[in-house]
């Protein structure tokens, strides 16, 4: 029995240790760092870079020597017959030339000497790599913003639950006291019913937010690249994060559109279209290739090719091929015209992107400044609403205020509390959006 108890205690002990190991305690900065290493989007983007690097090498190898080997074997089940008048008697005599079996082996090296499309293709492959790298940079920025928003949503949920629990506790006390006063005949039944309605509404809100809590944690795990049911504990508070994310200097920071990742991506898109036009133009240039072949052939009436005394006859060949496009029925000209139109469109998109990013920077600065002002106002308003509600509660129990006045004060308090919580989230989220709009790199 003692052994069984010992085993149970040991099992519980190690299970507790395992559970602790599986629980992550993370500040917002740590959550971002973790996500940039483990999120699904970042990992996929890094794979895209590796893919692009392999694509560059694949394109490069087109211009490098290409060596192929060939081995052939023939066995004439019935050899072809040739007719010839060898004895000049006027009659063709049948003859069989050659051996019944033969085998040949060869090695051929092909080398591209000049191809305009190869040069353009090599440039395009490098541009493709740059696009993949820029896409990864954008993914990193999006991941950072997603983690900030998800982390903030968890804190909002936690704070909302705490506020609702506090409100329910106070309201429950008021409801109980009002019910006792009603039993003693000092107030109306409507006062009790009014508080009961408010209490029921608060409990429903608490139940709803409590259910949303697990979803908020799962969304944070997903943004970080965790299994969605991973246990995590957030070490930052909503209030501390809000204060840390108030930076008026950020609002006055200059915006350089040429440094923005979206502008760079748009520039690369234009470069891609330019290379496509050059590719179509290069198809009108000649293509020059060279080849070198070494071979050996053996002949026999029986399969003796693996014998040491089998005679093999060597051969070698060096050659050059020149291919010159002459006439394509104006199909090439049509393709060049299409590529030119695509390049013109890319120029327009580049100008549009520049204007859009400049406007976006101004808008996000304004949104961020407004969110700071709303936060400061909401913080002041929630304190005022608490004082008003407290005064109305005292007046209500002293019999000099109605339940309607108390209800108004309570609803005003609850609204201001939620406004305050949401204003803190807005500061955090809008700062992340502004940093992305200004293309401030992740630290």
Annotate each PLM feature:
Residues 30, 54, 142-257, 371:
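Periplasmic alpha-helical coiled-coil/stalk elements that build and connect Gram-negative outer-membrane
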């Amino acid at each position: 029995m003692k052994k069984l108890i010992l085993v149970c205690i040991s099992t519980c002990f190690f299970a507790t240790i395992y559970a602790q190991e599986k629980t992550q305690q993370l500040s917002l900065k740590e959550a971002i760092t973790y996500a940039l290493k483990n999120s699904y989007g970042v990992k996929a983007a890094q794979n895209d870079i590796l893919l692009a690097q392999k694509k560059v090498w694949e394109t490069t190898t087109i211009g490098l020597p290409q060596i192929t080997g060939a081995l052939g074997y023939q066995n004439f089940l019935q050899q072809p017959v040739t007719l010839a008048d060898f004895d000049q008697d006027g009659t063709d005599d049948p003859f069989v030339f050659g051996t019944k079996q033969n085998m040949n082996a060869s090695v051929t090296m092909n080398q591209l000497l000049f191809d305009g499309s190869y040069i353009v293709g090599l440039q395009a492959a490098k541009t493709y790599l740059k696009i993949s790298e820029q896409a990864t940079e954008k993914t990193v920025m999006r991941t950072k913003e997603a983690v900030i928003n998800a982390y903030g949503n968890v804190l909002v949920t936690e704070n909302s639950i705490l506020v609702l629990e506090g409100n329910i506790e106070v309201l429950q006390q008021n409801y109980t006291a009002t019910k006792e006063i009603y039993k003693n005949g000092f107030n109306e039944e409507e006062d009790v019913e009014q508080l009961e309605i408010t209490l029921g509404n608060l409990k429903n809100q608490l139940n709803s937010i409590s259910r949303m809590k697990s979803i908020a944690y799962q969304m944070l795990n997903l943004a970080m690249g965790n299994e969605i049911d991973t246990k995590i504990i957030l070490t930052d508070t909503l209030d501390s994060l809000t204060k840390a994310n108030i930076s008026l200097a950020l609002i006055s920071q200059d915006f350089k559109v040429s440094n923005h990742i979206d502008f760079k991506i748009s520039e690369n898109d234009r470069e891609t279209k330019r290379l496509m036009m050059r590719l179509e133009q290069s198809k009108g240039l000649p293509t020059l290739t060279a080849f070198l072949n070494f071979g050996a052939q053996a002949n026999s009436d029986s399969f003796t090719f693996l014998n040491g005394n089998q005679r093999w006859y060597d051969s070698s060949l060096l050659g050059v091929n020149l291919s010159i496009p002459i006439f394509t029925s104006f199909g090439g000209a049509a393709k060049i015209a299409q590529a030119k139109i695509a390049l013109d469109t890319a120029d327009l998109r580049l100008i549009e992107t520049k204007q859009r990013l400049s406007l976006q920077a101004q808008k996000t600065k304004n949104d961020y400044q407004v969110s700071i002002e709303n936060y400061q106002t909401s913080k002041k308003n929630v304190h005022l609403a608490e004082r008003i509600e407290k005064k109305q509660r005292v007046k209500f129990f002293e019999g000099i205020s109605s339940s309607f006045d108390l209800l108004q004060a309570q609803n005003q308090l609850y609204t201001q509390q939620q406004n305050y919580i949401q204003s803190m989230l807005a500061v955090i989220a809008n700062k992340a959006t502004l940093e992305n709009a200004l293309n401030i790199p992740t630290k």
